[in-house]
Swiss-Prot record:
Coiled coil: none annotated. The NRPS-like protein ATRR has an unusual domain arcitecture (A-T-R1-R2), with the adenylation domain A activating and thioesterifying glycine betaine which is then channeled through the phosphopantetheine arm of the T domain, the thioester reductase domain R1 reducing glycine betainoyl thioester to glycine betaine aldehyde, and the aldehyde reductase domain R2 converting glycine betaine aldehyde into choline. The modification O-(pantetheine 4'-phosphoryl)serine is found at S565. Keywords: Multifunctional enzyme, Oxidoreductase, Phosphopantetheine, Phosphoprotein, Repeat. Residues 1026-1256 are annotated as: Aldehyde reductase domain R2. This is Glycine betaine reductase ATRR. GO terms for molecular function: oxidoreductase activity; phosphopantetheine binding. Disruption phenotype: Severely impairs the hyphae growth and conidiation at high level glycine betaine. Exhibits a choline-auxotroph character, when the phosphatidylethanolamine N-methyltransferase choA is also deleted. It is an enzyme of class 1 (oxidoreductase). Residues 528-605 form the Carrier domain. Pfam families: adh_short (PF00106), AMP-binding (PF00501), NAD_binding_4 (PF07993), PP-binding (PF00550). NRPS-like enzyme with an unusual domain architecture that converts back glycine betaine to choline via a 2-step reduction mechanism, and thereby can be an alternative source of choline. Permits direct reutilization of endogenously stored glycine betaine for on-demand biosynthesis of choline and choline derivatives, including phospholipid phosphatidylcholine (PC) which has an essential role in maintaining membrane integrity and functionality, or choline-O-sulfate, a mean for intracellular sulfate storage. The tetramethylammonium ion, which mimics the head group of glycine betaine, acts as a competitive inhibitor of ATRR A domain, whereas the potency decreased by three orders of magnitude with dimethylammonium. Choline is a mixed inhibitor for both glycine betaine reductase and aldehyde reductase activity but more potent in competition against glycine betaine in the first reduction step. Therefore, choline could act as a feedback inhibitor to regulate ATRR enzymatic activity.
Length: 1270
């Protein structure tokens, strides 16, 4: 019995419903809604406009719109005008859209203004978001409207990929959907009040609710494959019915185990597009106990063929769920290769006849004839049946079961892909002579693999396919993006000499194709070293079972060792927390050995990863949305002012240098977040050990570092780093500045594999900052931008979200892009944030300490060993020394007054690698150029088999993933024009033969090279003593003792701030000291002016860090007779010697006491111990210095301050020539003939005092000429 009037067309059925329920809600999207009457009015107005363009029976109206209310209106209007709607996907690349328009020749295209530029040629266009205009000369006298019972006329055309390179348009008459809807209403009817969300199969769903009085809710494109957004929409819009693919449902269930509670109003869920596994069916039934789950099988050419209630038809005896009973059993046949019907239970090809068939493919008579063949089982003249290409069988229960594919069409995450179309475009647009595209993997792991035979002739239009060791080809993907939809582009590529053929048929034998490549990692055995290993699983077994980990073996069974239902639930929870994705109990129970659990965890991980990658644009959009509660109104805090700093990434390369520089240049307490899978307080010793091991390897460790460091065991991949809410809140209240340098770095892994740490971790960092008002200094990367060519990207460059999947081709860059977006959004919400984009971080410019995993280093070292280097046009070496990067970040973090948010720390003009190898030749490492392909072949034959390990570490790196030539050329250059003036005090080392000498000397020391480089300059030893990295302020530094002390401090590795009145002398001294590699700051300073002294200390603190050492050398000495009353000289003596020391102490001592450490050294005199005639006022001033220092020493005892008075005797300085009292000079200032002190003698005594251990105080140093004792 018909539920609807199957004699009327779709437009008439809609009009009937308008009359029946004019005020009922018919349609809504995220912007607007329409009652049936309002919708009818919109449809009528647009249909009249369409008629003016000549739309009539079988005319096509192109619909190039997002999934929205406008899309539905356009389709209904096309039908009311008497024509048919033509679906034009927004995802079509320009060439594919042009092919469809040329093939279908629509009378007009309905679109939005933003899409009109895509439509080429003379096709008329109607923009729904612009005011109506006339037909611009296209007005055609419309013919009569077709009668409403003409069900054979065209209703809609949808395109799928074709095998010859041209897409094919499937032409469906009104009869097909009308009869299909009637059958589906027999399975599950709709009624007023029902709310149907239309998303994945949009055009197949939008009209059905509108002929039964229900409401159509148009799901936006960006929600359709975004599980989180889709569930939110289904819940907030009170959806009662929807349809989705099994893959999408599986993804939703993995994230929302309580989906039934989230969607209490969802009464019906249709599944279509893929086979439903029994496992998924069972999970769905449990998760949605109050929802009717309907498994539906259909084809674009046939509409619905079978449908069944999953709860009634699922069986544990099969891996897959049957589809259900046939909806039209009279016209569905399962046939063998001879075209004969098979018996029940026997598999064959499913063919469908009857009145619901499509007309065929427009303008494709041959293709139509192959797919729609004469129906031998029908008595109707001219009847045809459609070959679905699916293998099926009828079960004894009367249910249809799909068992596989007969033809070549590939089902991929709900998409249908015809390999021939993909193969044709690969051959046409790449330098490929022959190609075969197949599917590899199952379920969510299913992906396209292209097997290619290379064409030796290539051009700009047909570039060579470069395939990296992991089987990916970013260049091929970029080239095909213009011609194929994203889901049609192969994920993996394999180059073969020839495609295997079948011995009998001569056709390509797909079964004989080799498997796709497995990624080769650094274990050197040719197998992928999976980051999840059996040791990880065993550690959690040991906790759950309370057994020693060392006793566990791969074949052990969880239940045999005492496991039970509660302990396996605990195990599931622990594994899920550790790895960041849900691991169901049932999966663990199915294969309960230790090795079985390892396989299970890996399989679920890979499925989780594939689900994310399948719908990357939607995932990116969701992940780049910041939680609403993350906002702040805190003021920015500099590192100089911070009392507590949180540092992440400290066990990495850059993080180690950041820790060392933070300790050396700030007074802050530093909390280091160290990663542990299951963070516990007991992990703190392990955290210390990991930091120590890292810093020792890089030559940075000294035991005093830990005096200022606290270990925080945590995990960035976990909510709140794995801390309790209270611990997280307490941490937030303590931290003033967060330096977030941690990241999971892997240029091979996809987005999903790096997402938790890089995106989730940054989100948690921002959450922490918002709760306590901390400032966030975020370390980003040049990888958030695509290759830049010769000119670099300026600081304000931001890649648009829609370009991320196609222009950032590695998961690392994609995750860092999303993380950066979160940081910038937090900044817009009031959080004080800074973003530091860094380039390729190379070794230390002075020590050469290198990142052992650096790819560029590996290529250089391996080239030296081969005697050949890759000669690649456009390959530039971006090397930014790590010490520069670290100090630049810290310096920029202290520039709180600037408004700039994004800083670039990289090489704005990287050198060509050819010049690098020329410089290496001067260092004694000659190499000759070789083409990239030949170099790779040579390396593979001569070095690829070499044993790895410490001595062959660079071999391991290249074995783990040889880069492609496109990767080498695709350098991302960062223009630092806006950053450079702000960080001008931090100079970037030049990449030249001197830097390369430092690097190669280090590589030799690590055993990577067989001989040291030829020395280019006299090497200065890198100071490693107790003064290395300390910050010292020296007054009176322009000459004499002050200059000697500054020189001695720089020689010890201390950074120095020089103050004196003669700036030219200071600059000259700075040039000399800077050559030793230390930082030097100069500031014109008169110590009698308190503001100038404060300015000197402020400059030292901002440029170098908190002051560790004060050496007050400024002083004057005049020989005067008391009776001669030389008032000007007396006043000058008191001002400089007395007020000067007070100003110096006032500017430095409070900061030292706050840090609990510091050393004050002041030049007194032996005249401060005994009065010398002719130097009465001078002696008095030095007695003042001694009294002041003694008081300071006594009052601060126990507070970490050391105070040293240095009492030089007669020293060769300019002071001896300052006096004007001739009588005093004659009487008391004549030389005795003894050898007096040099300034360096005094300086050395000061260095001796400064080098003493913290508990040793040298309170006074009396240093005199041997023959002039007091």
């Amino acid at each position: 019995m018909a539920i609807i009037d199957t004699t009327k067309d779709l437009s008439a059925l809609f009009t009937q419903q308008v009359r029946a329920s004019p005020n009922a809600l018919a349609l809504e999207d995220d912007k607007t809604s329409y009652t049936y009457a309002e919708l009818d009015k919109e449809v009528e107005e647009l249909s009249r406009r369409l008629r003016s363009y000549g739309v009539s029976r079988d005319s096509l109206v192109g619909v190039l719109l997002p999934r929205s209310a406008h899309f539905v209106i356009a389709c209904l209007a096309a039908l009311r005008a008497g024509g048919a709607f033509l679906v034009l996907e927004l995802a079509y690349p320009p060439d594919l859209l042009a092919d469809v328009l040329e093939d279908a020749t629509p009378a007009v295209v309905v679109t939005h203004r933003s899409e009109t530029g895509k439509i080429k040629g003379s096709v008329p266009v109607i923009s729904l978001d612009e005011p109506p205009v006339d037909a611009n000369g296209h007005t055609v006298e419309p013919g009569p409207l077709p009668v409403d019972d003409d069900l054979d006329r065209l209703a809609f055309v949808s395109y799928s990929s074709g095998t010859t390179g041209k897409p094919k348009g499937i032409a469906n008459p009104h009869r097909a959907p009308v009869l299909s809807y009637n059958l589906r209403f027999g399975v599950q009817d709709l009624q007023p009040g029902d709310r149907v969300a239309c998303n994945v199969f949009f055009i197949w769903e939008i009209l059905r609710p509108l002929i039964r009085g229900a409401t159509v809710v148009a799901v936006p494109d960006d929600h359709s494959y975004d599980p989180a957004a889709l569930v939110d929409l289904l819940a907030s819009r009170h959806i009662t019915e929807t349809l989705m693919t099994p893959t999408l449902l599986a993804t939703i269930l993995s994230r929302h185990s309580d989906i039934g509670a989230r969607l209490p109003e969802l009464r019906t869920l249709w599944l279509n597009g893929e086979v439903v596994t029994t496992d998924l069916a069972r999970r769905a039934i449990r998760a949605l106990p109050n929802t009717r789950l309907l498994n539906c099988y259909s084809a674009c050419e046939t509409h619905e063929i079978a449908c069944g209630d999953i709860k009634e038809i699922v069986s544990d005896e099969s891996q897959y769920c049957p589809v259900g009973p046939l909806l039209d059993p009279k016209h569905a046949y399962i046939v063998n290769e001879q075209g004969e019907k098979v018996e029940e239970g026997v598999s064959g090809e499913l063919c469908v006849g009857g009145p619901m068939l499509a007309r065929g493919y427009i303008n494709r008579p041959e293709t139509t004839a192959k797919a729609f063949i004469p129906d031998p089982f029908s008595n109707s003249p001219g009847a045809v049946m459609y070959r679905t290409g699916d293998r099926a069988r009828m079960l004894p229960s009367g249910l249809l079961e799909i068992t596989g594919r007969v033809g070549a069409m590939i089902k991929l995450r709900g998409y249908s892909v015809v390999p021939g179309k993909v193969e044709n475009d690969i051959v046409k647009h790449l330098a490929v002579r022959q190609c075969a595209v197949v599917a590899h993997g199952e379920g969510l792991e299913r992906q396209l693999v292209a097997y290619i035979v290379a064409d030796q002739e290539h051009s700009e239009e047909r570039p060579t396919v470069e395939i990296n060791s992991s089987g990916h080809s970013p260049g091929a993907r970029r080239a095909l993006t213009k011609f194929l939809a994203h889901y049609m582009i192969p994920a993996l590529w394999v180059q073969v000499d020839e495609l295997p053929t079948h011995e009998v048929s001569g056709k390509i034998d797909l079964k004989r194709l080799p498997p796709p490549p497995t990624e080769v990692l650094a274990n050197g055995n040719g197998k992928k070293e999976d980051p999840i290993g059996i040791e990880d699983i065993a550690a959690i077994w040991a906790v759950a079972l309370k057994v020693p980990k060392a006793t566990l073996k791969p074949e052990d069974n969880f239940f045999d060792l005492g496991g039970h239902s509660l302990s396996i639930a605990d195990l599931s929870s622990r594994l899920s927390r550790k790895f960041g994705f849900r691991i169901p109990i049932v999966r663990l129970a199915e294969n309960s050995t230790l090795s079985g659990h390892l396989d299970t965890v890996r399989a679920i991980r890979d499925g989780h990863t594939a689900a994310v990658q399948a719908d990357l644009p939607a995932v990116l959009r969701t992940d780049a949305t910041l939680d609403e509660e993350i906002r702040s109104d805190a003021k920015i805090c500099s590192l100089t002012d911070a009392k507590t700093v949180l540092l992440t990434g400290v066990t990495g390369f850059l993080g180690a240098f950041l820790l060392k520089d933070l300790v050396d240049s700030t007074s802050a307490h530093i909390i280091c977040l160290v990663r542990f899978n299951e963070p516990e307080d007991d992990d703190q010793p392990g955290g210390v050990a990991r930091i120590r091991r890292n810093l020792l390897d890089l030559g940075l460790w000294n035991d005093s570092i830990m005096e200022r460091v606290e270990i925080l065991p945590g995990n960035l991949s976990r909510s709140r780093f794995g801390l309790t809410p209270d611990a997280f809140q307490e941490l937030a209240q303590r931290v003033d500045v967060i330096v977030h340098a941690a990241a999971s770095v892997n240029l091979v892994y996809p987005y999903a594999a790096l997402r938790a740490a890089n995106v989730g971790g940054t989100r948690e960092i921002l959450r922490l900052a918002s709760q306590g008002g901390a400032t966030v200094q975020y370390v980003s990367t040049n990888g958030v931008l695509p290759p830049s060519g010769e000119k670099g990207w300026p600081e304000d460059t931001m890649l648009d979200m829609k370009d991320v999947p196609t222009k950032l081709l590695d998961g690392y860059g994609q995750t860092k892009w999303v993380a950066e977006q979160l940081v910038l959004e937090a900044g817009r919400r009031g959080l004080p944030v800074r973003v530091h984009r860094i380039g390729t971080v190379s070794g230390h410019s002075q020590s050469g300490a290198a990142n052992a995993w650096d790819l560029l280093t590996a290529l250089i070292v391996e080239s030296i060993k081969l005697g050949k280097y890759p000669d690649v046009e456009g390959w530039r070496a971006e090397m930014t020394p790590v010490d520069f990067v670290s100090k630049a970040i810290i310096h920029l973090a202290n520039q709180t007054a600037v408004e700039q948010t994004v800083f670039h720390i990289g090489d704005p003009d990287p050198v060509n690698t050819r010049s690098v190898f020329e410089d290496l030749k001067t260092l004694g490492y000659p190499t000759e150029p070789l083409s990239w392909d030949d170099w790779v072949a040579l390396w593979t034959s001569q070095r690829g088999h070499v044993k790895g390990g410490d001595g062959g570490f660079t071999v391991d790196i290249l074995r783990s993933g040889m880069p492609s030539i496109e990767f080498l050329r695709g350098i991302v250059v960062l223009d630092n024009s806006a950053t450079r003036p702000i960080r001008r005090e931090v100079e970037r080392p030049k990449v030249d033969r001197f830097l390369l000498e430092t690097y190669t000397r280090h590589w030799f020391a690590r055993g990577w090279l067989k001989r040291p480089p030829i020395r280019q300059r006299q090497l200065s030893p890198i100071p490693k003593g107790p003064l290395s990295g300390k910050v010292a302020v020296v007054t009176g530094a322009s000459s004499g003792i002050g200059a000697a002390v500054a020189t001695a401090l720089a020689r010890e590795g201390a950074h120095v701030a020089l103050g004196a009145r003669r700036l030219d002398a200071l600059e000259s001294l700075k040039e000399k000291l800077s050559a030793s590699g230390v930082k030097v700051v100069t500031c014109k300073t008169d110590v009698t002016d308190r503001k100038q002294v404060e300015g000197l200390v402020k400059a030292a603190t901002e440029e170098l860090g908190p002051v560790d050492i004060l050496v007050a050398c400024a002083g004057v000495m005049y020989f005067t007779m008391m009776a001669n009353t030389q008032m000007d000289e007396w006043e000058r003596t008191v001002d400089v010697n007395c007020k000067g020391i007070l100003n110096s102490l006032a500017s430095t001592v409070p900061g030292m006491l706050a840090r609990g450490k510091g050393h004050v050294v002041a030049i007194s005199s032996d005249a401060g111990r005994k009065v010398f005639p002719g130097l009465g006022v001078y002696s008095a001033s030095k007695f003042f210095v001694e009294a002041t220092l003694q008081a300071l020493r006594l009052e601060t005892a126990g507070q970490g301050l050391r105070v040293t008075a240095v009492q030089p005797g007669n020293t060769a300085t300019d002071l001896l020539g300052m006096s004007t009292d001739a009588e005093a000079i004659k009487k008391y200032g004549e030389p005795s003939g003894a050898q007096i002190l040099d300034p360096e003698d005094v300086a050395n005594s000061i260095i001796y005092a400064l080098r003493q251990p913290e508990h040793v105080a040298m309170n006074e140093i009396l240093i005199e000429p041997r023959d002039e004792p007091i």
